C-alpha cells in the first residue's frame, strides 16, 4: 500500500521480466505480466469510478472478474455462482456541524473535513448528535486484561465522549519487546479496535487524535478515507450497540482542546505510555451533529474454484480485495476519483494472473480458491464476512497468500514479510525466494501495523495460516534509499488519493518476480500433503489446532 515508481529503461525492464518468467516456468507456467498490465489498466480506469462497493464501479468489477475466471475455465465457487453476497450499509454523513468543545478556558471548534471527520456505525438512518457530552481523555483506549492494562480503569464513560491516541503505548521504542510488542503494533493499536472498545465501554462518541507518525499516514488520507460514503457491516440491531459518533480530530485541534482544558497533549501522551495510566476528565463538553443518508445494499465477494484431483476437499486460498474508495476528496486539479491502481487493482489482477498460470500448469492434488473480497478499505468487511461464513470450510483450508498493493518500484533484492516468523509458510516462501535470488526480511516499520491492515488478518484470526509480503525495499537500482524514497512518495502523494493511477511507464520487473513467488508458494501448497501451522506460542496456533482436530 505504500510504494511507487522509479523507472528502468524499457529494454532492461523487458529483460528483467523475461528472466523472471523463465525462472517461474520451471514449475509449469509463468504468471503473465501482460495479463497484469491489461487488468490493472482496466480496473483503475475512470470507467470503474474507483470501484467503491454498491456503485456502478462494483458491478463492472464483478462482471470483469467473473468473465475472466470463466474464460480461464475455473468453476463458480459458491454453489454454481461466482458471487457470495455480503450485506452492507452505505452511510453518508450530511450537514455536519462543527465539533465544538465548551466549558474550558475558551471554546474550541473543529470544522468537518479540514479539522475533523465524523460518522457512525449505526444504520437506523436517524440523525446523529451528541450535545454537551462530558469529554474524557482515555490515553490509547486499551483494555487488555491479559497485559494488566486498562485505560478505562476507574471511570464510567457511558454517554460520554472519549478522546483516544492512535497506535499503542510501545510504538516509540526501538525494541520489539514490551507489553505491546515494543515498536511492532498490536491489534490494540488499530483504529478499528479503538472504536470497538469505546463501544464496549458505552461511550457516546469516540474521537481519535490524528498523528502522522503513529497513524502511518497523513491527514490527507483521513480526509479521503472518511469523507463521503462509508461502508458498514449490516446487523439485526442496526448496530445500536456501537457508539453514536466515531471520528478523528486533527493534531492541531486536539492540542487546542487540551490547552483549553488546562492540559498539554504532549504530557498526556507521555503519561498514557506508562503502566498505571488513569483516564483524565477534561472538564469540557463536546457537541456535534449530522444527518445520515443510509442505503442498504448487497455487495459481493467473487469466488472462483480450480478443483483438485486427489484431495479436492482440501483448499489453498488466494485473496485480494477488489474495492477502493470510489469518489473521494478532490485533488487540486479537480480529479475526485480515487482509482486505486496500486491499491488494489494490482492485487486483483494478480489473482487472475495466478489463476491463469495454474490452469496452464495443469491440475494439482488440492483445490485452489481465488477469492476477491469487497470492502477491505472499510475495515476488511468482505474478508471478515467470508471468514464467518466460509464457502469452503476453514478447517479444510490448508493456507494461503494475500495480495495487496504490489510494488511497481522495480526489482528488489528482498521481500518484506508482514508477520515474519509467525507460521510455517515462511519456509515455503524461502524456497521460492531461492529461485529468484532474493531474501525475506522483516518489516522496517512494524509500528505501522500492516499485519492488521489487509485481508489475511481476517483468516489468521480464524486459524488459517496466511502469507502476506510486500515487494521489497532494497531495490536493485538505488538500494534501500531508493526503496524508502519510493515508499514515501507513494504514501504522501498517491495512497488513498486521486493520483493512485495507472502509468504506462511503470516498472513491472519487480511485479513479475513477486508473481513468481506467489505462484510457487501456492503451487507447493496445492501439490503436497503437508499442513502448515502457526509456530508454537503464536496467538493463532491454538485456534488452528482446535479446528484441525475436528477434521481428524
Briefly describe each language-model feature range:
Residues 14-15:
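C-terminal motif of bacterial Sec signal peptides marking the signal peptidase cleavage site
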Residues 23-25, 111-245, 307, 336-339, ...:
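Extracellular/luminal Protease-associated
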Residues 30-48, 53-76, 100-102, 106, ...:
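Catalytic-core environment of secreted peptidases
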Residues 31, 35-38, 42, 56-68, ...:
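Extracytoplasmic/secreted proteins, especially bacterial periplasmic and envelope-associated proteins
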Residues 49-176, 280-283, 290, 294, ...:
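Noncatalytic luminal/extracellular "stalk/propeptide" segments of secretory-pathway proteins
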Residues 102-107, 115-154, 238-340, 356, ...:
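Soluble metallo-hydrolase cores and metallopeptidase-like ectodomains found primarily
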Residues 113-115, 127-128, 153, 159, ...:
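Metal-dependent peptidase/peptidase-like ectodomains
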Residues 356, 360, 476-544:
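His/Asp/Glu-rich mid-to-C-terminal helical/loop segments that flank catalytic regions of hydrolases
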Amino acid at each position: 500500500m505504500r510504494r511507487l515508481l522509479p523507472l528502468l529503461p524499457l529494454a532492461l525492464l523487458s529483460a528483467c521480466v523475461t528472466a523472471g518468467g523463465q525462472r517461474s516456468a520451471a514449475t509449469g507456467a509463468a504468471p503473465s505480466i501482460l495479463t497484469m498490465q491489461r487488468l490493472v489498466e482496466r480496473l483503475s480506469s475512470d470507467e470503474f469510478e474507483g470501484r467503491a462497493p454498491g456503485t456502478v464501479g462494483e458491478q463492472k468489477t464483478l462482471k470483469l472478474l467473473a468473465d475472466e475466471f470463466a474464460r480461464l475455465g475455473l468453476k463458480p465457487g459458491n454453489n454454481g455462482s461466482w458471487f457470495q453476497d455480503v450485506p452492507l450499509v452505505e452511510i453518508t454523513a450530511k450537514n455536519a456541524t462543527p465539533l465544538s468543545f465548551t466549558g474550558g478556558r475558551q471554546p474550541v471548534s473543529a470544522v468537518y473535513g479540514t479539522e475533523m471527520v465524523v460518522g457512525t456505525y449505526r444504520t437506523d438512518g436517524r440523525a446523529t448528535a451528541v450535545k454537551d457530552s462530558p469529554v474524557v481523555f482515555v490515553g490509547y483506549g486499551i483494555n487488555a486484561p491479559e497485559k494488566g492494562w486498562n485505560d478505562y480503569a476507574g471511570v464510567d464513560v457511558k454517554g460520554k465522549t472519549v478522546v483516544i491516541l492512535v497506535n499503542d503505548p510501545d510504538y516509540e521504542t526501538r525494541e520489539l519487546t514490551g507489553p505491546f510488542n515494543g515498536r511492532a503494533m498490536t491489534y490494540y493499536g488499530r483504529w478499528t479496535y479503538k472504536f470497538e472498545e469505546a463501544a464496549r465501554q458505552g461511550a457516546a462518541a469516540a474521537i481519535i487524535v490524528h498523528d502522522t507518525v503513529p497513524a502511518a499516514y497523513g491527514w490527507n488520507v483521513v480526509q479521503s478515507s472518511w469523507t463521503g460514503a462509508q461502508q458498514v457491516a449490516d446487523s439485526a440491531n442496526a448496530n445500536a450497540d456501537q457508539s453514536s459518533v466515531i471520528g478523528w480530530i486533527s493534531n492541531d485541534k486536539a492540542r487546542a482542546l487540551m490547552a483549553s482544558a488546562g492540559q498539554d497533549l504532549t504530557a498526556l501522551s507521555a503519561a498514557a505510555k506508562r503502566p498505571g495510566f488513569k483516564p483524565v476528565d477534561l472538564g469540557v463538553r463536546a457537541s456535534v451533529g449530522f444527518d445520515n443518508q443510509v442505503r442498504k445494499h448487497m455487495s459481493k465477494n467473487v469466488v472462483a474454484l480450480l478443483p483438485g484431483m486427489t484431495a479436492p476437499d482440501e483448499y489453498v486460498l488466494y485473496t485480494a480485495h477488489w474495492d477502493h474508495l470510489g469518489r473521494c476528496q478532490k485533488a487540486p486539479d479537480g480529479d475526485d476519483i480515487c482509482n486505486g491502481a496500486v491499491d488494489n487493482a494490482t492485487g486483483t489482477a494478480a489473482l487472475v494472473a495466478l489463476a491463469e498460470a495454474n490452469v496452464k500448469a495443469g491440475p494439482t492434488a488440492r483445490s485452489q480458491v481465488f477469492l476477491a473480497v469487497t470492502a477491505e478499505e472499510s475495515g476488511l468487511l468482505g474478508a471478515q464476512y467470508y471468514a464467518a461464513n466460509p464457502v469452503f470450510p476453514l478447517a479444510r483450508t490448508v493456507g494461503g497468500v494475500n495480495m495487496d498493493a504490489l510494488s511497481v518500484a522495480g526489482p528488489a533484492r528482498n521481500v518484506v514479510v508482514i508477520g515474519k516468523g509467525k507460521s510455517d509458510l515462511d519456509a515455503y516462501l524461502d524456497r521460492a525466494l531461492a529461485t529468484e535470488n532474493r531474501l525475506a526480511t522483516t518489516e522496517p516499520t512494524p509500528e505501522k501495523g500492516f499485519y492488521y491492515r489487509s485481508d489475511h488478518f481476517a483468516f489468521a484470526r480464524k486459524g488459517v495460516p496466511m502469507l502476506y509480503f510486500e515487494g521489497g525495499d532494497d531495490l536493485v537500482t538505488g538500494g534501500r534509499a531508493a526503496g524508502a524514497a519510493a515508499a514515501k512518495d507513494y504514501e504522501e502523494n498517491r495512497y488513498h488519493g486521486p493520483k493512485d493511477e495507472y502509468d504506462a511507464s511503470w516498472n513491472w520487473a519487480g511485479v513479475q518476480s513477486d508473481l513468481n513467488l506467489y505462484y510457487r508458494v501456492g503451487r507447493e501448497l496445492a501439490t503436497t500433503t503437508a499442513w502448515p501451522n502457526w509456530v508454537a506460542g503464536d496467538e493463532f496456533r491454538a485456534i488452528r489446532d482446535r479446528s484441525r482436530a475436528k477434521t481428524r
